Every structure is written in structure tokens, then in C-alpha cells.
């Protein structure tokens, strides 16, 4: 598995890096959580901007991003607007999504930006190039809350993300049986062993898939999302449990 380093955090090497989400409606609540997470064991904080009531207000977005950067110090900041189509809290047009991503990049506050693979469509390479020009790494994501596609399809999707220039392809899928979890893990191994251009982030959701959030070092997922009190997706494991298990399963 390959690796990338951001703010001295090496993603894709050793223990999977842990991300905790901020899912709050107001700027005050968002910054309060950021201050609390700044001293947590997490490596990265994801701001789920789709929860923020004023996310599409340029001034409010800029102010909140500056506050987050100040509160988090050297801890990584991943900014995500999860669309309703992929399980998020708010809907937005393609132009609004493009403007949001551009504003996040221009702010100079984000280390990582989540760009949805299907929402960006043909514009994905352009959006990724814009992020890179601003020094922002891109998590290119795809979520399926209904099923787990076959392994070949999962691998092909992550390869297309790599080809578009993504720094961290991310897949989250829902299992309907135990073999679905194995399909996701097998796709992860294939990417980590044979397609080394980037690290990848993968997870099988829900209670059945929770094990996939804990075995990334063995199977090749570079980051995992933990629940710090409020989950942002089904199957997220509490942060203290994630830390304990990841330490117990370390390969070196």
C-alpha cells in the first residue's frame, strides 16, 4: 500500500488513521466540537458541512472554516458536503456543489476535501485539479446504502478515482450477507497490493460490516471513521473502542 503525508501524518503506513466527524447545525456548536476534538486521539476531523444550516452562505462558510482551522491546530481537517443522494443531510445543485468545493479550496483552511465520484461526474478531474492547485488533497468517495457491488466493480470504481487524480479513493457499501463484507475486503486487498498509486479508504457499513472498520492495517484500508458520540454513518464504532482494537491488531 502506498502512502501520503499531510501535516506530518502519514496516511497509508502502519496503523489506520482515525477520523471523527462533526455533525452540528450551528457555527458555535461546530467550533465547540472542534475544540474538544483537537485534543482527542483522532488523527483527522471531518466537518460534515451538509449538516451546517449556512453551508451555502459564502461568508458563513468562510468564517466557519477559519474557526475550524484555528481550533484544530495541526490536526487534519477533512471537509465534506455529503449530498442527499449519498446519505447526506442536504440537497444542492451541481453548480452549488462546484461552488462549495471551490470555496473550501480557496479558503486555505482544509487539508482534505471530499468530492463525490458520481456527483462530480465528468467534472471530477477538473475539480481535483482545482483542489491540488490550492494544496488540498482529495478524498474521492462513493457510497451505496443498499448493497455491495461485486468485487470487480468496486476495484474498477476505485481505479477510475485514481485515474481522475484522487489522492484517496473511498468506498462505503452496505452488506446484505457475510460474503458481501468479504467482497469489500477482497477489493481492498487488491487495491493495496496491485494498484499502488494511492492509499484507499474502504468500509462495509452497518453492524455486519463493522469489522471492516477495524482491520484496515491487515487488509489495506488507510483510514477509518470512529464515533466520538454522534455517528455520521451506520456501523461506526466508538472512538475509544477503535483505538483499543487498532492498537491490539497492529502488525508492527
Language-model segments: residues:
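Short N-terminal or domain-adjacent regulatory/targeting segments
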Residues: 1-5, 238-241
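Catalytic alpha/beta core domains of metabolic enzymes, predominantly
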Residues: 102, 112, 117-252
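Active-site beta->alpha loop and helix N-cap motifs at the rims of alpha/beta catalytic domains
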Residues: 2-3, 14-133, 143-147
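Short boundary motifs at domain starts and secondary-structure transition points
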Residues: 7-13
